[in-house]
Amino acid sequence: MNTLALSDEILLTIDKPARYIGNELNMVKKNPKDVDIRFAMCFPDVYEIGMSHLGIQILYDMFNKRDDVYCERVYSPWPDLHKIMKEKNIPLFALESQEPIKDFDFLGITIQYEMCYTNILQILDLSQIAMLSSERKEDDPIVIGGGPCSYNPEPIADFFDLFYIGEGEISYTELFTLYKQCRKEKVSRKEFLRRAASIPGIYVPSMYEVAYKEDGTIASFTPKYEDVPATVKKQIQMDMSHSVYPEKPVVPFIKAISCTVVLEFQRGCIRGCRFCQAGMIYRPVREKDVEVLKHYAYEMLKNTGHEEISLSSLSSSDYSQLEELVNFLIDNFKDKGVNISLPSLRIDAFSLDVMGKVQDIRKSSLTFAPEAGSQRLRNVINKGLTEEVILNGAGMAFEGGWNKVKLYFMLGLPTETEDDMRAIAELANKIAVRYYEIPKEERNGKCQITISTSFFVPKPFTPFQWARMYDKDSYLGRAKVVNDAVKEQLNRKSIKYNWHEADVTVLEGILARGDRRIAPALLKVYEKGGIFDAWTEFFDNNRWVEAFAECGIDTDFYTMRERPLDEIFPWDFIDDGVSKKFLIREWERARKEEVTPNCRMQCQGCGAAQFKGGVCFENKN
């Protein structure tokens, strides 16, 4: 076992020291001297969250299958250790070798959520790597960003040497080959980055320059050199059944957010909800063969000792082989004490039958995500869920023994009116009425309905990327309308209402659609002590307000205005496969309250067919 980077004295004074010692079950062990490339894979949040992330496990497995690469892991130190490392000048280290990140060739950071941006700076700072890419030395690691937030990398572009746009299974081989060649030729860091910019899916921010108009919008976004492409096209794994997948995932030492075998059975979504970024950037839908999934289930349970299988997908019910897969898992593993988790199911007879087999009905809740209370607003957002379907599904569930329902909605959606807000409470009441229509002797106790509302944040590459947002007071006012409406309902005692923090929503909106001018404010927030901003107990909105003011940033510019259709967005240089023409058409259909059929019902010509596979080609021979 390697010598630990932290002394016993430190480990005994911090919370959950097992976060930092490595050596877990299935951890890959190599001699760093035997490889050409050392890659530190980072999730910029605490160990328990990072260890639950499937994407990290996939890349960790894929990289370590190579003889020339050693991939190790690193997560954000909790604030108690952060303070000690700063005081004692201890450099951040990888779990496997316990060696400093600054000695690696690459530091890859997956970026899943905008509120983790300050943790990216924490990782760089504790690693003793210059936070600004322009200030890095020749022997510093190449810092790579990836994940969904890289579809608008501009607010954090100054901190990264390059971004990988798309799914990680595709272009890393070419990047590693180039890196080894450049090292052999002893070319400069800048020359490596310039050559890397020509690799499909690789975006090198320093190779592009941005000009702005007097009104603050972007005038142009252009490459600095002729051999640097003007457009960066996302990379996508089309053959899901033969793609790399971790049969021996690392098992955390302490309880993580998800200690389960995760079976990813498809990527993408056919539904086309107009607010949903994942539904657009992961197009087209691609399925994994059920026989492959059966093999993974056996192997991963055997290799981990986990007692739960979780199915991973944006919309589980749309998987064409779902019934066969679920019945296989139930028949082969339920009697062995293995729980089966089925998220993202539509509530219909099949789903209720399945959930009745795998869940304790008396303890579990039924989850609906109508997103909007009224049918009008559900049409605006293209949520293919009618009130009739919701009430019928709830009725079948209640008759099957359920009595707990969770409802998820968004406030602040485009075209929303007060009637739409009140409709949230009215829908919850109708569900309660449906429960109490069941004879008393057949009910399972009292009905419990929980309403949760988040505030809508427009995201890049969605039809709502042109939409405006609102300020904190407006969001809280909308939540009050819903809260007051709940109190007016006949079954109000059966309804509980929760809502999201408005300050965080506004910040998410600034960061989600921001540009390079946001970076100085991020640095200021970190300098003021901002880390773990995704955690309520550490988030301090005043830091952000002060930082934006000190940097002269008008936050309303990023949140409070509807964008004209011809505005150049910071992310327009990325080709994610879905055309801007399609997004504009969907934005206009939303305003007309028109519903667009899902991909299996009718192709809408979004552009994803260019990838020549998946759902786009299901009916073509």
Regions found by a protein language model. Give the residues of each.
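Glycine-rich beta-alpha loop elements in corrinoid/cobalamin-binding modules
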Residues: 77-222, 463-515, 522-537
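N-terminal [4Fe-4S]-dependent radical SAM core
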Residues: 10-40, 47-48, 205, 211-262, ...
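N-terminal pre-triad scaffold of radical SAM enzymes
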Residues: 41-45, 63, 249-277, 301, ...
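Conserved SAM/AdoMet-binding glycine-rich loop
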Residues: 41-42, 46, 115, 298-406, ...
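Canonical Radical SAM [4Fe-4S] cluster-binding loop centered on the CxxxCxxC motif
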Residues: 53, 255-291, 602-620
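Radical SAM enzyme core and accessory elements
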Residues: 1-28, 39-41, 488-621
